[in-house]
């Protein structure tokens, strides 16, 4: 689970301007952190299908935001993919 401090650090690293919390970059970075956090949960709880459904929902939401960013600004998209080490 991400702490408030972790979220604030992620937002500061990815914000476009001061006070920016809603840009696609920030949203994708927060979703990526939550997804990575859940990956560790599934290493020990292999049969937790209820939480797995939530994980798939987060992955789908991240994919939609990345598709939006790709259509809007390809350079920002590529920079974000490289920064977060996402494959695509």
UniProtKB/Swiss-Prot annotation:
Signal sequence residues: none
Gene Ontology biological process terms, A to Z: translation
Record has Plastid as a keyword: no
Composition bias, Polar residues: 1-20
Keyword Lipid metabolism attached: no
Region Disordered: start-end pairs: 1-24
Molecular functions (GO terms): rRNA binding; structural constituent of ribosome
Keywords: Ribonucleoprotein, Ribosomal protein, RNA-binding, rRNA-binding
InterPro entries on file: Ribosomal_uS15, Ribosomal_uS15_bac-type, uS15_NS1_RNA-bd_sf
Any single Gene Ontology cellular-component annotation: cytosolic small ribosomal subunit
Coiled coil: none
Pfam families for the chain: Ribosomal_S15 (PF00312)
NCBIfam families the record matches: S15_bact
Record family assignment: Belongs to the universal ribosomal protein uS15 family.
Subunit structure: Part of the 30S ribosomal subunit. Forms a bridge to the 50S subunit in the 70S ribosome, contacting the 23S rRNA.
Function (record text): One of the primary rRNA binding proteins, it binds directly to 16S rRNA where it helps nucleate assembly of the platform of the 30S subunit by binding and bridging several RNA helices of the 16S rRNA.
UniProt protein name: Small ribosomal subunit protein uS15
Taxonomic path: Bacteria, Pseudomonadati, Pseudomonadota, Gammaproteobacteria, Thiotrichales
């Amino acid at each position: 689970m991400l702490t408030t401090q972790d979220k604030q650090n992620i937002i500061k690293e990815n914000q476009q301007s001061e006070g920016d919390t809603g840009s696609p970059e920030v949203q994708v970075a927060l979703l990526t952190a939550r997804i990575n956090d859940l990956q560790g949960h599934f290493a020990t709880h292999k049969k937790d299908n209820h939480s797995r459904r939530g994980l798939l929902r987060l992955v789908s939401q991240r994919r939609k935001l990345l598709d939006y960013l790709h259509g809007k600004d390809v350079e920002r998209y590529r920079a974000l993919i490289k920064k977060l080490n996402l494959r695509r």
